[in-house]
Design a protein with these regions (language model features):
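Conserved N-terminal beta1-alpha1 strand-loop-helix module at the mouth
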Residues: 1-87, 91-98, 102-105, 109-110, ...
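Internal catalytic-core helix/loop-beta-alpha segment
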Residues: 109-113, 117
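Short loop/turn elements that flank and shape the SAM/SAH-binding pocket of Class I
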Residues: 120
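Short glycine-rich anion-binding loops that position phosphate/pyrophosphate groups of nucleotides
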Residues: 138-140
């Protein structure tokens, strides 16, 4: 099984001091870049222009976490902007296997995100094209929500699945 990676989110960063905020996390494995479209979640956050600014300001690889409706149609925007990894929600993707394969063919690591209520067994048919799995501890949307118990249960049940195919974070 892959190792645990540290990926601080820029969602709570001081955007007026983005470079300084990114300098503080220079030793992280990834910068976690939350993208919310106001449809899949009730909130609206960053687009590709901010991702480009992040990429210009740090050497830390960027994981674009797409909390959007129809991520299959938008992954190329974030790949073109320089995302090193793109994670899409299982619950939002119509053609998940195709989207993950497409990302990998472009040289972008492909991740899948599961909401707290989604069973981990849904990964069985796509695990061969998954570089990373993110188990949400809260329902997607706003920051500072109460932690859900579901992810710890999902993590325990995901171990056999992840062990069957080596994950590549």
């Amino acid at each position: 099984m892959g190792s645990i990676k540290i990926a601080p989110s820029v969602l709570s960063a001081d955007m007026a001091n983005l470079k300084g905020e990114l300098d503080k996390i220079a030793g992280a494995d990834y910068v976690h870049f939350d993208v919310m479209d106001g449809h899949f979640t009730g909130n609206l956050t960053f687009g590709v222009d901010i991702l480009r600014a992040v990429k210009r300001s740090t050497d830390v690889p960027v994981d674009a976490h797409l909390m959007v409706t129809n991520p299959d149609e938008t992954v190329d925007w974030y790949a073109d902007a320089g995302a090193d990894m793109i994670t899409v929600h299982y619950e939002a993707s119509t053609h998940l296997h195709r989207t993950l394969t497409h990302l990998q063919q472009r040289g972008v690591k492909a991740g899948v995100v599961l909401n707290p209520a989604t069973p981990v067994c849904v990964l069985e048919s796509i695990i061969d094209v998954v570089d990373m799995v993110l188990l949400m501890s809260v329902n997607p949307g706003l920051a500072a929500r109460a932690l859900s118990r579901a992810p710890s249960q999902s993590f325990t049940s995901s171990r056999p699945c992840a062990s069957a195919t080596a994950c590549r974070p």
